[in-house]
Amino acid sequence: EIDLILPLLDKKRKVSQIHYGGGTPTFLPALELKELNAHVSDTFELIENPEKAIECHPGWMTGQDWEKLATAGFNRFSIGIQDFNKQVLQTVHRQAPLLQPEEIVTILRSCGVRINMDFLYGLPHQTEASFAETIEKAVSLKPDRLVTFSYAHVPWAFPRQKVLEKTGLPSGDEKSRMFEAARKILCEADYQPIGLDHFVRKDDELYTALLNGQLHRNFQGYCTRRTTGQVYAFGVTGISQLGTAYAQNTKDIME
């Protein structure tokens, strides 16, 4: 697909960020991801030291998997924790991490990569106190970035979400209190808020961009470069952004 689309792209435009996500790409073997990274590097002109990020499902990855992935060319890992509370994870049918979070962080730090942690609030069995406990544990692990996403309950779009209604979901007011509790903990730990849901350490490039008036946002989220308003997406359901226009790939893998 990359080779098919390449003739239509601006060959003078340098690529500054590469992101594997919109799902859980770590179901692919590390060797295949390494080969794909190499093909992207050979195909596009990259800036010096571009960001190469990948979203990871810790419920599927062993220590060896983390180590192999860290040597596959990635320099930023987004770990989809969602919650440290086992009851919450079981209710939403989310596999708990195979390794203790401390082990994962130790492995990645030894490989010299940057670490993001993603959390969801508004899930069944979550309370203000339980989510605060999760965020406090996250802070103790000292990730470079921490993101608190609000769970969007849209069963008409994703019918499998309907089953969560049997357990019950937190109200809007309860979700607001969860977020405010998390925000308070993060700010007291000297994490800096970026927009609505990102919190970063003071040495993070997003915070530097915010201070310098160079923070931007594209379809993927916050970024430090205006040029990332151009997003070339590949793969099933991938969404490209070309200036103010968007285009989405088919959701049918056979198509």
Task: Label each region the model flagged.
Residues 1-8, 14-255:
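C-terminal scaffold of the Radical SAM
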